[in-house]
From Swiss-Prot:
Protein name stated in the entry: Fibrillarin-like rRNA/tRNA 2'-O-methyltransferase
UniProt cross-references to Pfam families, sorted A to Z: Fibrillarin
Signal peptide stretch: none
Naturally occurring in which organism (per UniProt): Staphylothermus marinus (strain ATCC 43588 / DSM 3639 / JCM 9404 / F1)
SMART domains linked: Fibrillarin
HAMAP family referenced in this protein's UniProt entry, alphabetically: RNA_methyltransf_FlpA (MF_00351)
Length: 234
């Protein structure tokens, strides 16, 4: 296994690090909030008295978006995030590293079996707050979520943008950010992905979002795009 020759902060993305390896390869990483613990079998690196977790571009759509040049990484230390579709917590664990011990990630997942796996991650990472719930019904968990700085959404639903906007109306601060992974094939298998992206983006615009960037996630995820937007509360 190739050895580390340097780890340095990413020049563009807050809370993200570049790992340079002996074989010339370069990896993305986050500083491990819980040293010694892995979440999904990722490689751990030690450098300068700190531990870093490799951020797998093929396992995390946010990592893929960063690798493909997303305009900005808006998540900051201490932020509160609403995560819709947290699954087993791969991406959420890296966001957990970035927001740190003073941040909070309200993590909504619909599938009980998947949530059971996520709870094991949240037991170790105290800034993750598991919520077994349906992202289509934000009213049902409104008593569990505070106003948040940002929403991260990765939900396989036909009306992804509308669901996110409904949640934003409840929980997202004015000028709060959205990172939405659009899964074209989850919305309509009969239409071209570009048509789906355009439709979902138009929905976001109609609901008060200003689109800052849209990045396609190939080769890491086929027929996916990451939308980065800001919300203007009415």
């Amino acid at each position: 296994m190739s050895q580390v020759v340097n780890i340095k902060p990413h020049e563009k993305y807050y809370g993200v690090y570049i790992v340079e390896l002996e074989d010339g390869s370069v990896k993305l990483a986050t500083k491990n909030l819980v040293p010694g613990h892995r979440v999904y079998g990722e490689r751990l690196y030690r450098w300068g008295g700190e531990e870093y977790r490799e951020w797998n571009l093929y396992r995390s759509k946010l990592a893929g978006a960063l690798a493909n040049g997303l305009a900005e990484q808006p998540i900051r230390e201490g932020h509160s995030i609403l995560y819709l579709g947290v699954a087993t917590g791969t991406t959420a664990s890296h966001i957990s590293d970035i927001v740190g011990p003073t941040g909070r990630i309200f993590s909504v997942e619909f599938a009980p079996r998947v949530m059971r796996e996520f709870v094991l991650v949240a037991d170790i990472r105290k800034n993750l707050y598991p919520i077994l719930g349906d992202a289509r019904k934000p009213k049902e968990y409104r008593h569990l979520v505070e106003m948040v700085d940002g929403i991260y959404a990765d939900i396989a639903q036909p009306e992804q943008a509308a669901i996110v906007a409904d949640n934003a109306d409840y929980f997202l601060k004015d000028n709060g950010y959205l990172l939405l992974a659009i899964k074209a094939r989850s919305i309509d298998v009969t239409k071209e992905p570009s048509e789906i992206y355009r439709r979902e983006i138009n929905t976001l615009k109609e609901r008060g979002f200003e689109i800052i960037d849209v990045v396609h996630l190939e080769p890491y995820d086929k027929d996916h795009a990451m939308v980065y937007a800001r919300y203007k509360r009415k």
